[in-house]
């Protein structure tokens, strides 16, 4: 059906060039990368998403891949009223149950995961022209898992977990340094540092895991594992790029 012509009262729209008010510098609209590193077909996929992720994670973790931190991912959450937030985190484990990260539970991601327990992880492996996107529910890992992982951390990281009241406003860096010094005196070298009660693991339990491979002309390959029932049965689907 043809749309009605604008009335005399309709405001006239003026075309504005993208970025007209931005500061001088590189123009993001002019930056283009052609993708041609590989392809992804259904017959190439592993039987399960976790096996496929393990393959790609191994590829990204090799020195020749040029990926600085293969376990780095963007973790997106949202508040109870739907306001999103995102940040880069480090993956610390994965298996058939999902992907595990660790954080301060009083941080923004910790609070949002409690009040709106859903999230997404994006692994951007740029040099391989690959991306993995997982979406699903977020749950806390067991205290046993948390304590086992915390015990494996470097002592400085353990003290840092106690020192940082993550996501809270502080007056200066001096506040952090003073807390760190106080905690180092409380637990001197050789003394086990206990796991903070406000710190622990989050597991993203995926409903979908999408594997993206860049292709020429923006006609990328997108293959998705999707949970189809509670019995852990999965469908594999190709998505239009």
From Swiss-Prot:
Which pathway does this chain act in? Cofactor metabolism; pyridoxal 5'-phosphate salvage; pyridoxal 5'-phosphate from pyridoxamine 5'-phosphate: step 1/1; Cofactor metabolism; pyridoxal 5'-phosphate salvage; pyridoxal 5'-phosphate from pyridoxine 5'-phosphate: step 1/1
Give me the gene this protein comes from.
Answer: pdxH
Output the GO biological process annotations, alphabetical, semicolon-separated.
pyridoxine biosynthetic process
Q: List the protein's name.
A: Pyridoxine/pyridoxamine 5'-phosphate oxidase
Any idea what job this protein has?
A: Catalyzes the oxidation of either pyridoxine 5'-phosphate (PNP) or pyridoxamine 5'-phosphate (PMP) into pyridoxal 5'-phosphate (PLP).
The residues that hold substrate are 32-35, 92, 149, 153, 157, 218-220
Keywords, ordered alphabetically: Flavoprotein, FMN, Oxidoreductase, Pyridoxine biosynthesis
Subunit structure, per the record? Homodimer.
> What detail does the entry give on cofactor binding?
Binds 1 FMN per subunit.
The answer on whether this UniProt entry bears the keyword Nucleotidyltransferase reads no
